[in-house]
Amino acid sequence: MTARNLFLLPGDGIGPEAMGEVRKIIAYMNEAMDAGFVTDEGLVGGCAYDAHGAAISEADMQKALAADAVLFGAVGGPKWDSVPYEVRPEAGLLRLRKDLQLFANLRPAICYPALASASSLKPELVEGLDILIIRELTGGVYFGEPKEIIDLGNGQKRGIDTQVYDTYEIERIAGVAFEMARTRQNRVCSMEKRNVMKSGVLWNQVVTETHKAKYSDVQLEHMLADAGGMQLVRQPKQFDVIVTDNLFGDMLSDVAAMLTGSLGMLPSASLGAPDGKTGKRKALYEPVHGSAPDIAGKGIANPIAMIASFAMCLRYSFNMVKEADDLEKAIANVLDKGIRTGDIMADGCRQVGTVEMGEAILAEFKALSA
């Protein structure tokens, strides 16, 4: 069997605790399923800065580049608030995204039936919610040049950011969206601001042309991004796959995340382009939540987002679709049984810590995969 190489970067805060529960699942899969996972581990974020003076070392960067997939925990915390900007903990994640050329960020917003009452919206609006937001990750206003603050004199300054998209960047992210839609409900909604932004005009044109040329079997809708934000909280279940640029994707995916009730529940994936020879994509998987330094080391963090990120890894990097389905079903089954970490605790449920939640999910996964 060909080895499946995983590089683990637990990071800071609750990252190591959540990653610990994924390690148990990997060990079980190797033992019971002969899955062939080979794991290595490195430092990223604040802990890497403490050890190496950088948010990720060159050696660990090379290991990430060589791996089939990277599992990432979380970075940051008040301890590193005063470090130089270029070596801040978050710079490690940005370096990974850049060097791995990860242009497509996949953010599922799934509301488990057992948690519908935890959403800020009415349960009937979110129960059964299953949206996939696909955000372009390497272009747009976050990376466009010029990006600077100019001193105009007389006490006045000017901040400049530049929104830039080329045709190929839009084509490839649209292609990912249409391909993902084919495995779901076959619907894509593209969001931009073509009414006020030239980049939005081009985005709309290129998505439309890509759809017509290669993906006419998929239903395509266009929506202005501000209207899309409104519709996400008005009638979220109307959406299947949403594709949008870096800035709007950053905002809309966080809006969608809170429809589900807890950031501690949500995974994400960042994918690169398929390799010309093997067809494999570089990929990084991470929970949406941050490092939560206030609860780090207390054993109470919710590991579900990290475990669900590993399920995405099984699906998209290793084509282990049944195993991914089983792991996601295991999470749902545990929630149906009323087992909760503190962040999603509700009346009548049983509160557990990180390890007990992880072990409950593993037990369900074992039963489903037996």
Curated annotation (Swiss-Prot):
Q: Which SMART domains match?
A: Iso_dh (SM01329)
| Pathway recorded for this protein | Amino-acid biosynthesis; L-leucine biosynthesis; L-leucine from 3-methyl-2-oxobutanoate: step 3/4
Q: What's noted on cofactor binding?
A: Binds 1 Mg(2+) or Mn(2+) ion per subunit.
Residues that bind Mg(2+): 226, 250, 254
A GO BP term here is:
L-leucine biosynthetic process
User: What InterPro entries does its record include?
Assistant: IsoCit/isopropylmalate_DH_CS (IPR019818), IsoPropMal-DH-like_dom (IPR024084), Isopropylmalate_DH (IPR004429)
Report the subcellular localization.
Cytoplasm
Give the top-rank taxon of the lineage listed in the UniProt record for this protein.
Bacteria
Query: By its UniProt entry, which Pfam families does this protein fall under?
Result: Iso_dh (PF00180)
Catalytic activity annotation: (2R,3S)-3-isopropylmalate + NAD(+) = 4-methyl-2-oxopentanoate + CO2 + NADH
Site note Important for catalysis, residues: 142, 193
- Return the SUPFAM superfamilies for the record: Isocitrate/Isopropylmalate dehydrogenase-like
What protein name applies here? 3-isopropylmalate dehydrogenase
Organism from which the protein derives: Rhizobium etli (strain ATCC 51251 / DSM 11541 / JCM 21823 / NBRC 15573 / CFN 42)
Organism taxonomic ancestry: Bacteria, Pseudomonadati, Pseudomonadota, Alphaproteobacteria, Hyphomicrobiales
- In the UniProt record, what gene is named as encoding this protein? leuB
